[in-house]
Amino acid sequence: MKKIIILIILTLSLTGCTKTKKEQINVLNWSSYIPDEIILDFEKETGIKVNYSTYSSNEELLAKVSNAKKGTYDLIFPSDYMIKIMINKNMLENIDKTKLKNYSNLNEKYLNQPYDKGNKYSLPFLAASTIISINREFIKDEITSYNDLLNTKYKNEVVLIDDERIIIGMALLANGFDMNSVEKNELEIAKEWLLKLKDNIKAYDSDSPKSFLISKEASIAVLWNAEATIANWENKNIENVYPKEGVALSIDNFAIPKDAQNQEIVYKFIDYILEPTIMKKIIESYPYKNVNKETDKILSNKYKNNIASNIPDYIFRKGDFVENIGNNIKLYDKIWVDIK
């Protein structure tokens, strides 16, 4: 009897030792970018646990990854200029495209961008543009330019993205300068322009600027196109306009941090997201510009016929990406403190 009991105990012990740990992936992404149902469906389909956390700016992303223990994050979604910064800091793994059966679904026009020639370290996930949203219930004037926002009638009516590069870049564009200028005299003019705008500013908000429009707390906003699209869906009085001076562009990308612990699982997750039907759900939930050419074929007319969600090619050609300006960022930092 004792021998039998010992054998049972040994068998149970060995079973416990051979039990495999559940696979998991640690994802760090922008808020709202991937609906919860997509994550849950991936977990059900694969048995892989997704630990999902968010950030609200590229700088916050950089700080989180820099300060975390090596291997903390497996997949991140930096924007264009941040990809370049992280490449220069040796913070990203090379992307092995041969592990992605859905790589060919990506639209070539969003590949091989200046911040990562050859897509050695990143792959496009979503594209975006800034845009002006106007609630026509309250604003009857024609608005075609950033300079129209200076109208004193709009006191406490304007919401801006809480992003110094985008908003100082907007002021530079409004004055006919390059959005990434580091010329001190041009930056001083941009600063004075923003100080003129100050009385009109209701709030700076990067998380949900559309909420101010939908709730009618503000009548005008400079925001990203997905937020503008949702505002229009919620309230048909909200009109979206691309300013004549040009816009800020952004591409958010899949990227694998250096020393990521679960890289094979990362490729499974990226491939899942690149499935046309999965990308359709993501795009139509949070309507940024789609970069998946197979998804283009199945998108709804609601998405395709909205100029805010489906950014026209001519707008993309005219727009500018935020560029890495090195230590000159201190010039922007000082202006940001002064105008806020």
Protein language model regions, located:
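Extracytoplasmic ligand-binding site segments that recognize negatively charged/polar headgroups
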Residues: T72-Y73, F77-N200, D205-E217
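Ligand-binding "clamshell"
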Residues: I87-N94, D116-K120, I230-Y242, K304
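A bilobed periplasmic-binding-protein/Venus flytrap-type ligand-binding module shared by bacterial periplasmic
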Residues: I131-F138, L173-A174, S250-N262, I270-I273, ...
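Mature extracytoplasmic/periplasmic domains
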Residues: P257-F316
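A ligand-binding cleft/hinge motif common to bilobed small-molecule-binding domains
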Residues: I83-I85, I214-S215, I220-N237
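Periplasmic-binding protein-like
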Residues: A128, L187-K196, K202, E234-K258
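Extracellular/periplasmic bilobal clamshell ligand-binding domains
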Residues: L299-K340
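Early extracytoplasmic/lumenal segment of secretory-pathway proteins
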Residues: C17-I85, S211
